[in-house]
Amino acid sequence: PLHYLALSEVLDEVEVIPVISTEGYGDFPGPEVLTLSGTKNPAELKDYIDSLYREEYYKGVVRDDVVDLVPDYMRPLIKERVVGKRVPEARKAVVELLRSLGKHDTIYEVLNGPIYCRCGTEIVVKVIRDQWYIDYDNPFWKSWTLKALDQIDVVPESSKRDLARAIFSLKKRACSRTRGLGVKLPWDESQIIDSLSDSTIYMAFYTISHKLNYDPEKLNEEFWNYVMLGNGNPIDLSKSIGIPEDELKALREEFSYWYPLDSRHSGRDLVQNHLPYMIYNHLAIFGENLVPRRIVVNGFVRVGGKKMSKSFRNIYPLYKAIEEYGVDPVRLALTVSSELSEDTDFDTSSIKAITDQLRRMYDLAVNVSKLKSSGENGLPEKWLLSLIHYKVREVNDLMNSLDFRKAFNVILYEFYDIVRDYISMVNFPNKYTLKTVLNIWSRLISPGAPHIAEEIWSMFNEDLVSLQRYPSPEELQVDGQALVQLEYIRYLIEQVKALASLTNKQPEKLIIYVSNSDELGLLRAVLRGLKDRNNLRELSSAIGLREENLKTLLEKIQTLPSTLRDFITVYSIDEFKTIIDNLNFLMRKLDVDEIQVYRSDDSSAPDIKGKKNSTLPLMPGIVIL
């Protein structure tokens, strides 16, 4: 219909040859568009043409008389494969027939066009003759690249498979073009080097770019061969190009210091092109010893759960976010909203929540700075520093594995909760202990929130936190006994809260039954067996417990905090005494008026709701009243 309309505007008469028959339409539905062509509503004409195309494509069949339109030798094939067929099937048959006869040609069309350059110019597809290419399908080079990929740490691991598939599928690729900005191809100045060909190793240039204060004419091929490949003699090179020998050596040392790349971060859309080319080209130029050590594939930024797009009207410039919320909350919100390889959702509610949490941490630091007395230095202080030791270790491990989301969640929230628990435990908080913790916290959060880190650091120190080393767990000693006892108390609080939530009842009084300390040996035996990776049958036989009972015990053990599981095999605990010693803290934390504690083997103790005999080591029976 559209073609008919176009032809009718330039020709007096248009001969129409019907090919498709569509039920409900005449032999020539095209001329009907002339009736609508004068409409004042172009959308009406477009809707009609689109609906006609759809009807013909999905419901139309090829007419019987099309055989009269082809030469005699083709008529049997047309009658067999095309006549009476629906349009999609007939199209495929015609293409195959023309291909077999050598009578077909291919026209490439940009289906999602028009496409525009960043400068606003419409992009056109052009065939370039005598174009240079790089043969990424060379079998030796391809196998060498796949082998090198095995030695590269890829985050996430799934992207390594995607990279391998991309490398395996790469063919010859043009490395030059005839127009646009760029460097001319050295051996063919009619061509310009395509950016994707050489931009995959530009990181090597960054290593020395800040020191290249020389005339460009001096930076010849021998210069680059020495600086980046170590080829040649700096004495001879110095005489040849006029750059002092010590400066040449310094450039070579600078490059050698930074290369190979420790970590290459890139968007996941570049897994199919830039990143595999980078590995290929690093191998070809520098050899396998200087390929990147790690490749990290990032996701994209989304706003309100949607991809940033002008059509969605949700473009949120970074400067606007910083002006509204500040640098630290924006950085942390983008970091903790998703895993590194996933899309990051820019959510204003998340930013506000992080802002509130930073303010809470700041207020806490202010209160600590105002403390007059050092306070006590007992079990709670030892527990606090011991637990912070493990949190620092956890954060370091997460940072090293690039799991920034979990790392900053630990720093932001778990640290704060731990400090609040400590303050609730004691009558007079120890200022020195809290200062130690806040100094560690400032250094931990500094990469994500440098401004708040400096503010809190300055409350207790004269210099800058940005000049300090990142915290190490070795800075703090561990008191296993204190850690076991107070982690048990915190675990007990969690269990009571979970039970209260399950029963939908706010407790006023608690009855707690604890296991006999002698039964702790059973739990230790199970935990040691798990560390030794014994299977269920071996473990059951070793400790003399039926497999069904062992399964139940293992399920309950998994609910214990990791610190308890790790240290209970070394340190003992008297659950009864530990609870009694921390009754005030428990009552404040759980907001109850009374707590009664009994040993499960105490014959004089009442059995409330059958909980007396339900205890296991570190897993008390709890009654809410």
Over which residues does each language-model region extend?
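Residue patterns forming the tRNA-binding/recognition surfaces of aminoacyl-tRNA synthetases
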Residues: 1-189, 199, 317, 321-350, ...
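Structured, non-catalytic alpha/beta "coupling" segments that mediate domain-domain communication
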Residues: 96-136, 351-365, 442-459, 592, ...
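Alpha-helical recognition segments enriched in aromatics with Gly/Pro capping
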Residues: 1, 10-11, 17-23, 164-342
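Core structural elements
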Residues: 122, 170-177, 356-364, 381-393, ...
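C-terminal low-complexity, glycine/proline- and small-hydrophobic-enriched intrinsically disordered tails
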Residues: 348, 352, 464-625
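Charged, glycine/proline-rich intrinsically disordered loops and linkers
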Residues: 38-81, 214-252, 530-573
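Acidic, turn-prone loop/beta-hairpin segments
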Residues: 374-396, 409-413, 417-494
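A glycine-rich phosphate-binding loop feature that marks nucleotide/adenosyl-phosphate handling sites
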Residues: 110-121, 183, 187-190, 294-301, ...
